[in-house]
């Protein structure tokens, strides 16, 4: 679930951008985050 644009995601990847993929460490126990490309920079902003 996403907050308004530019804000953080809420423990899921519904607001991952077009060039990012979803990463859920420890089986999603602490939620998921969006990762852009190969930089492994976690992006958790709404698009």
UniProtKB/Swiss-Prot annotation:
GO MF terms here are: toxin activity
Q: Secreted: present as a keyword of the record? A: yes
**Cysteines engaged in disulfide bonds, as pairs:** 2-16, 9-22, 13-46, 15-34, 24-32
How would you summarize where this protein is expressed among tissues? Expressed by the venom gland.
Chief location category: secreted
Written domain comment of the UniProt record: The presence of a 'disulfide through disulfide knot' structurally defines this protein as a knottin.
Spell out the protein name for this chain: U18-ctenitoxin-Pn1a
Q: Which organism is it from?
A: Phoneutria nigriventer (Brazilian armed spider)
């Amino acid at each position: 679930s996403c907050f308004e644009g530019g804000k953080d995601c809420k423990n899921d990847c519904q607001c991952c951008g077009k060039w990012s993929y979803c990463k859920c460490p420890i089986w999603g126990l602490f939620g998921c985050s969006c990762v852009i490309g190969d930089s492994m920079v976690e992006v958790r902003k709404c698009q």
